[in-house]
């Protein structure tokens, strides 16, 4: 699997951090630079119908050798999260023997007391950061795994397969990855995002998601003469957040539990703004959370009638479970592929979202498969090489098993 490691180390050198403040697609030039390099690589590999559009969506096809087999797709994203992502310098810990891992030359440490999952990888080769950037396994590991699986299929033409479509997207990390996805040139019956975490993850449920902005306008006067006239919006903002349920936050929830998350807060005496994200798996509970926020805004407005309190709610994405359940064979095929690759499937909900969630509602059912990575979006991100190899083996098995499926 030297090609897999080489690919991944090459990919993470591309600076592809997306930019939520830029409405263009892609939101950063680095994503287009990376996409052009991947386009050239796909053409050199011999893939057909390789197409890169002006928005940075890259699609290609590995033609099948079984005419009656269903065409499927594999999808990954090219951007990285809103965290330091320039000049990524990975380090490789060969045959990890346990204990803390020093990241680079500074004081950053991948501590086993904090990341107990490290004990699962004794004797394996871990790819980490140098402590100054993220790694970019989310989702450059997925891209490397997809193309390495295709390399294997090209080298083993006796493996039965239907048409295999590849789709690489920009701006997934800022929630726009599916906005302009070219379904007209991606004729797969169903697809899989390769954008999950640890070895064995298989996901077909995700959060319902919304964002909420609470804007509070007060009245600023000289503090020496403020009695009876000043309305400090920051005081009201603090009161508003203090009334939110403290046990329903990201740091206090897991599994199928939803939450409110105060992502950003800013203010002056005159005006304060609170930005929340709202998450829940259950449709009714999700609706109740949005209703609860409306009630709290109305309650604070009654308590402070001279202030102006406004709420803006925006739905982001929905739980894809309802779109996958009529097609559960695609989950069972993925599960069988993992078992064929000696991987124990871990079926769990995604406490987040993927391009696949949006695409599932656009008519392309799209569960999520593991990449092998841990601690995405930060300097403690790492991925075991052996987990990446298992991802490749799973994808090859998935293509083979799907070739025999007839619905």
From Swiss-Prot:
EC no.?
3.4.11.4
Xref: SUPFAM superfamilies: Bacterial exopeptidase dimerisation domain (SSF55031), Zn-dependent exopeptidases (SSF53187)
Q: Which Gene3D superfamilies match?
A: 3.30.70.360, Zn peptidases
Chief site of localization: cytoplasm
Q: Which residues form the active site?
A: 79, 172 (proton acceptor)
Keywords attached to this Swiss-Prot or TrEMBL record, sorted alphabetically, are: Aminopeptidase, Cytoplasm, Hydrolase, Metal-binding, Metalloprotease, Protease, Zinc
Spell out the Pfam families in the cross-references: M20_dimer, Peptidase_M20
Name the Gene Ontology biological process terms: peptide catabolic process; proteolysis
Report a single Gene Ontology molecular function.
Answer: zinc ion binding
> What are the subcellular locations of this protein?
Cytoplasm
This protein's GO cellular component annotations are: cytosol
Family, similarity comment = Belongs to the peptidase M20B family.
Protein's job:
Cleaves the N-terminal amino acid of tripeptides.
Q: What is this protein called?
A: Peptidase T
- According to its UniProt entry, this protein's organism is Aeromonas salmonicida (strain A449)
């Amino acid at each position: 699997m030297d090609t897999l490691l080489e690919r991944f180390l090459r990919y993470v050198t591309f600076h592809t951090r997306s930019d939520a403040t830029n409405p263009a697609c892609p939101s950063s030039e680095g994503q287009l630079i990376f996409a052009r390099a991947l386009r050239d690589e796909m053409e050199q590999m011999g893939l057909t119908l390789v197409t890169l559009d002006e928005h940075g969506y890259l699609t290609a096809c590995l033609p099948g050798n079984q005419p009656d087999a269903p065409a499927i797709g594999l999808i990954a994203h090219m951007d990285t999260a809103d965290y330091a992502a320039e000049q990524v310098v990975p380090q490789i810990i060969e045959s990890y023997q346990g204990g803390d891992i020093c990241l680079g030359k500074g004081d950053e440490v991948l501590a086993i007391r904090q990341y107990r999952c490290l004990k699962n990888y004794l004797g394996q080769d871990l790819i980490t950061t140098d402590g100054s950037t993220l790694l970019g396994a989310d989702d450059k590991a997925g891209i490397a795994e997809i193309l390495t699986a295709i390399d294997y299929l090209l080298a083993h033409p006796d493996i039965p397969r239907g048409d295999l479509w590849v789709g690489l997207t920009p701006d997934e990390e800022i929630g726009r990855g599916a906005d302009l996805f070219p379904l007209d040139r991606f004729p797969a019956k169903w697809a899989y995002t390769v954008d999950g975490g640890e070895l064995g993850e298989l996901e077909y449920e995700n959060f319902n998601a919304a964002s909420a902005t609470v804007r509070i306008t007060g009245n600023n006067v000289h503090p020496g003469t403020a009695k009876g006239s000043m309305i400090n919006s920051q005081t009201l903002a603090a009161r508003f957040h203090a009334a939110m349920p403290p046990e329903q936050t990201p740091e206090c929830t897991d599994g199928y539990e939803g939450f409110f998350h105060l992502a950003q807060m800013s203010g002056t005496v005159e005006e304060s703004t609170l930005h929340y994200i709202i998450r829940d798996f259950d449709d009714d509970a999700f609706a109740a959370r949005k209703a609860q926020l409306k009630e709290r805004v109305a309650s604070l407005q009654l308590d402070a009638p001279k202030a102006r309190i406004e709420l803006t709610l925006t739905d982001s994405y929905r739980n894809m479970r309802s779109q996958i359940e009529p097609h559960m064979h695609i989950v069972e095929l993925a599960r069988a592929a993992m078992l064929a690759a000696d991987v124990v499937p871990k079926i769990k909900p995604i406490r987040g979202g993927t391009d696949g969630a949006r695409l599932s509602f656009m008519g392309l059912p799209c569960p999520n498969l593991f990449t092998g990575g841990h601690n995405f979006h930060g300097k403690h991100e790492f991925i075991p090489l052996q987990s990446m190899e298992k991802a490749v083996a799973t994808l090859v098995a998935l293509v083979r098993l799907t070739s025999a499926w007839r619905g």
